[in-house]
């Protein structure tokens, strides 16, 4: 899994 940050307050977590 990983986390990808697109900007302040915006986060995508993929297992």
Swiss-Prot record:
One Gene Ontology cellular component: T cell receptor complex
Keyword Transmembrane helix included in the entry's annotation: no
One of the GO biological process terms: adaptive immune response
Record key words, sorted: Adaptive immunity, Cell membrane, Immunity, Membrane, Receptor, T cell receptor
Disulfide bonds: none
Localization annotation: Cell membrane
Subunit details: Alpha-beta TR is a heterodimer composed of an alpha and beta chain; disulfide-linked. The alpha-beta TR is associated with the transmembrane signaling CD3 coreceptor proteins to form the TR-CD3 (TcR or TCR). The assembly of alpha-beta TR heterodimers with CD3 occurs in the endoplasmic reticulum where a single alpha-beta TR heterodimer associates with one CD3D-CD3E heterodimer, one CD3G-CD3E heterodimer and one CD247 homodimer forming a stable octameric structure. CD3D-CD3E and CD3G-CD3E heterodimers preferentially associate with TR alpha and TR beta chains, respectively.
Its job: J region of the variable domain of T cell receptor (TR) beta chain that participates in the antigen recognition. Alpha-beta T cell receptors are antigen specific receptors which are essential to the immune response and are present on the cell surface of T lymphocytes. Recognize peptide-major histocompatibility (MH) (pMH) complexes that are displayed by antigen presenting cells (APC), a prerequisite for efficient T cell adaptive immunity against pathogens.
Protein name: T cell receptor beta joining 2-7
Gene name as annotated: TRBJ2-7
């Amino acid at each position: 899994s990983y986390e990808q940050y697109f900007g302040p307050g915006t986060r995508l977590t993929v297992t």
